């Protein structure tokens, strides 16, 4: 167990902001058709976490999956509070990035996105459902135990 406030990992900030929530290590997910935008529930019946919710969680996801429409769904989820508080990934995810950017531009709501090196990503994912705080600046970001 990591002490509250202790740094867990550092990475490259893809989108600035701060987000705190219980981590949800998850396989690739499409927000378009894979998640109910109203409550954040995973509705993709083929997904390992079917029935879980992304609402208020720190998604620890290697990369997204799906169409460009997923950006619109993510932006709407951030607006209505059914989206994740932060996304931690191991690869630059343009679709998720566009969704987070749209949420800030249109609604003034932020969802930080942090890219980690593969080893750091696997270490964070292995922590499981623990409270995390993700803080992203313009270039760098960090994850701390919450």
Feature locations, PLM:
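Phosphate/diphosphate-binding glycine-rich loops and adjacent basic-rich segments that engage nucleotide
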Residues: 137-146
């Amino acid at each position: 167990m990591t002490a509250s406030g202790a740094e867990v990992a550092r990475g490259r900030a893809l989108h600035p902001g701060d987000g705190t929530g219980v981590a949800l290590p998850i396989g690739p997910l499409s927000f378009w058709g894979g998640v109910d935008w109203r409550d954040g529930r995973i509705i993709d019946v083929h997904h390992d976490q079917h029935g879980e919710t992304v609402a208020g969680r720190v998604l620890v996801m290697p990369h997204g999956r799906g169409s460009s429409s997923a950006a619109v769904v993510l932006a709407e989820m951030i607006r209505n509070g059914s989206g994740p508080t932060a996304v931690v990934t191991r690869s630059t995810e343009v679709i998720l990035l566009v969704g987070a950017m749209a949420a800030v531009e249109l609604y003034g709501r932020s969802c930080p996105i942090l890219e980690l090196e593969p080893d750091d990503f696997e270490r964070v994912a292995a922590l499981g459902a623990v409270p995390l705080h993700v803080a992203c600046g313009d270039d760098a970001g960090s994850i701390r135990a919450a």
